[in-house]
Amino acid sequence: MSKPSVLFVCVHNAGRSQMAAGFLSHLAGDAIEVRSAGSAPAETVNSAAVEAMAERGIDISAQSPKILTVDAVQDSDVVITMGCGDTCPIFPGKSYRDWVLDDPAGQGLEAVRPIRDEIERRVQALIAELTQIRQALTTATDSDPPDTNRTDDQRDRVEPGNAPARSAGYRFEHRG
């Protein structure tokens, strides 16, 4: 089973999405593939965001804002937007979440710290959620194979006790 992938998107890819990607990479290690991008990338990462993350022992100073691409969205299992509104492409089969967070652009370190702390809490919850989903999928694929000793007739016959759960043992007929 391949590892899950997450794309963080904000307008400038200079603050919120960079901090989120930094936390996810730091806290999840190689267990989750991490991307970040912006719908209108800035020239550089927000210096207050870099400083706030350094206080947590996470260095995002070498990161640079990247443009949001269709490929980045298509290659991600979960897309988390942070204020980019309708500029983010939507693809079927992707899990989208919008994290409403203040924009750290133009803010000093004191104003960025609470944003950083909220992002950290949300990333920790995301890791827990993705870990649970991965464990559930692994358990489902590792479960015992179906009973192959039964004949086709026994498997296909619907009787109380062996009916699929969704039908609860009842037979549904269409009456015109």
What residue spans do the PLM features occupy?
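Short polar/charged helix/loop
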Residues: 1-142, 147, 153-155, 165-176
